[in-house]
Amino acid sequence: MPADIRADSEPGPRLPRRVRIGYGLGSLCTGTFATVPGLILLYYLTNVLAVPAAVAGAAVFLPKAWDVLVNPLVGAVSDRSRLRGGPRRPFLLIGACTLPPLFALIFAAPPLRGAAAAGYVAVLFLLAATAYAVFQVPYVTMPAEMTEDPAERGRILGWRVGFLGVAILLSGALAPAIAHADGDSPASYRTMGIAVAVLLALGMFGAWFTTRWAPAVARSEAEPSLRAQLAAARSHRPFLFLAGMWTLQALAIGVMLAGVQYFATYTLGSPAAVTPLFACLIGPLVLVMPLWNRLARLRGVKGAQWCASLLFLAGAVLLAFTPAGGPALGYAAVVLIGVAYAGLQLLPLTMLADTLAADVARTGKRRAATFTGLWTAAETLAFALGAGVFALVLAVTGFRSSDADHRVAQPEAALTGITMGMSVLPAVLAGASLWLLHRYREDRIGSVSPESEPPESVPQPSAMPPQPVPQQEETDRVD
């Protein structure tokens, strides 16, 4: 399938509305888990549990880095699964039963401080990240297996991104508000953990239940090992460039996400400022999403991605002038970043879904979960590394950790580091991603004859007839 959404595309059969909406509910989980740990956890460790910045960064980074190994394995296991209920939905249920309680326990730490507190949080966070991988990898795979029509995949992803915006807005605004309600006390963080766990459960169980009515028009074929999965990715250059571009942009977003609470507290002068900052970031997500979708249809997804990436870079640079221009300038810069962020949430996923379809046509293999497992592993590592990178900025600039009962003044170097880490560093990362976006070319479909049958290695579920290879379509060739 072409990576740009053309207005003259041949329409395919639509999925039931309840399936599209129900699938989107899963983003209440993915959006919340991608937001709250990155937003809250580092600050919780350094400003509530008195964990030194470098140690706190390791406690946040290492459990998420574990997902780099877990995600591809989950994808391979899911691909081979013959569980009752299909290859994907049972994993959604397992994740739904385990992630919410584990998340609540992260913020229910016993009265520990320093390295001991960091160890407790790291272990619980590692278990929670594993449970999240069990849910997320099959969840991200499902659109490519529900339909082979790119327009219908766009509609599915539209619901997903819409609920993603709701999840980020709710969790990003409510989690800090609850955590700060009692002066950053451990009790307020425990309450926050329970509230977020309820939101996670709502989205995860909702997606599991409603996708029972989803058709299965395709089935992925797993690569036999992690090495084989990486080899498959190396053989598909469009996927490599696309995944690399998104990894750098996710790292930039992860750095910003880790720094926003510090930016609110020390640059804007109020911990509560994180709530209006999130309103400025996520408000545009819902409002401008149709505009990004329209731009993708008119100019192609890659052209729209260029616009979103450049706008994100400009907003990040503008944010660096907040100390001189005042809070109003900072909020305006975050609005620009929010408009760009809406595009960055939609467009790479659309390109990924169509790139997976192109891989089927070229190779005759259905490896959606293999590629999405690698994609989510890279994304997870990027967001985790974002918190670690910002923690390193704090450590290098002399940030002083404290507990909830004893606040300390920060040196001027640390205050400057917070502002630069929130603005200049993400801008540099976004700029580097533009080279990979430039190298990306929409894949050409045509190496597999449309009349040919799928290779014997493609598994055919007993409940489904053999699936034909998608028809040839013309797009640009990789350089």
What residue spans do the PLM features occupy?
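Membrane-embedded alpha-helical bundles of multi-pass transporters/translocases
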Residues: P2-E451, D476-D479
